[in-house]
Amino acid sequence: MTRFLLLMLVCGSVWAKPLPQSVLLYNDTTGHHLIQSNADTVRPIASITKLMTAMVTLDYDKDLTRTLKSAGKVGGILPRGTWTRGEVMHAMLIRSDNDAAETLAADYPGGRSAFLAAMNAKAILLNMPNANFGDPSGLDSKNVTTLLGVKRLLLASSEYPIIREISVKKQALFDHRFKKKIRKIELPNTNKELLFEFDNIVVTKTGLTNPAGWCLGMVVEQGGQKYVIVILGARNKLERLKIAKEIMYNNITDTDLR
């Protein structure tokens, strides 16, 4: 039955055609690729980039209590504030804030250019095919790799406890002080629909730009197995969500969790 569902999935009959540009389901425990669509196509990955930004940031300094100054809006909140690195990391991984990614890059020794060099060096270390990073946020359409590259990025990020903790929070709540005023900050997760429905997601990151389409990367642990799901180039949020749910329910999650 599972094999039949997988065949339907790859052929595109489970949802409206056409399939996104690239779809992958990988069982890291067995080493088997269960679903692959356009696996070798080099594509922009949008804000999935921010997982690389998080890893390079943590490789440099895991202290999340140190404060940073942002000239932009972190999480679309307040300009020119002073933030802890933890708050900035939450804004980037949960709310997918681009200024948060730029703030972390600016804090790196040698600044933004050195940070980008470190991102590309990390991509080589992870053996991400045809990977290139032109900015820390994913807005740059030159941030590209293949499904295999995103898979390796996700698996590497799942080895960072801080990324596992932050990326799957349904929302973040904290107080932020600016000019003697305290403002309550609420950051809902950009992948909140799946996080509310499934409790076995251990890393997640969404992405969206016009060149990349609607993107999603997840690491899922179920029944002693570790899976990677990648969706690149969905036409809209609903299609991305529908494909992810079909993969989860038909191939990973126990049916009694529906």
Regions found by a protein language model. Give the residues of each.
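Sec-dependent N-terminal signal peptides
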Residues: 3-12
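Penicillin-recognizing serine hydrolase domain
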Residues: 17-22, 110-258
